[in-house]
């Protein structure tokens, strides 16, 4: 079972998780990261590294965020792989913790 990036990553895009991933299974969009479910080895190293607490094991994704399981799978097929940490988005602190950010997802 893979890990899943959820709502709170949108418009924050901290990349601390990318830095610790041993299999480079993160993919980067304009304002969101996703995990490729077929590449994730379920090591759980990324989950505690996320300052926004946006990463969950697939079986622990909150009920109101279930759509992110499929979203991660879909976007990982079209976005480029990211393997190194980058600066978060400029207004990440303002968006961290804001609920219901899916409408702000840039594809």
From Swiss-Prot:
Cofactor needs: [4Fe-4S] cluster; [3Fe-4S] cluster
TM ranges: none
Stored SUPFAM superfamilies: 4Fe-4S ferredoxins (SSF54862)
Record-linked Pfam families: DUF3470, Fer4
List of residues binding [4Fe-4S] cluster: 21, 40, 43, 46
Textual note on the cofactor: Binds 1 [4Fe-4S] cluster.
Domain of life from the UniProt record: Bacteria
Region (Disordered): 84-107
Gene Ontology MF annotations: 3 iron, 4 sulfur cluster binding; 4 iron, 4 sulfur cluster binding; DNA binding; electron transfer activity; metal ion binding
Keyword annotations from UniProtKB, A to Z: 3Fe-4S, 4Fe-4S, DNA-binding, Electron transport, Iron, Iron-sulfur, Metal-binding, Repeat, Transport
Its biological purpose: Ferredoxins are iron-sulfur proteins that transfer electrons in a wide variety of metabolic reactions. This ferredoxin could play a role in regulating gene expression by interacting directly with DNA.
Protein name: Ferredoxin-1
Species name: Azotobacter vinelandii
């Amino acid at each position: 079972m893979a890990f899943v990036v959820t709502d709170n990553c949108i418009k924050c895009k901290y990349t601390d998780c990318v830095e610790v991933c041993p299999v480079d299974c993160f993919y980067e969009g304009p304002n969101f990261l996703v995990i490729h479910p077929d590449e994730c080895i379920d090591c759980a190293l990324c989950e505690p590294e996320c300052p926004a607490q946006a990463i969950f094991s697939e079986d622990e994704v909150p009920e109101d965020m279930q759509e992110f399981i499929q979203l991660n799978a879909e976007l990982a097929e079209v976005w480029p792989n990211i393997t190194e940490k980058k600066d978060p988005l400029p207004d990440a602190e303002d968006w961290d913790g804001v609920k219901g950010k899916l409408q702000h997802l840039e594809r």
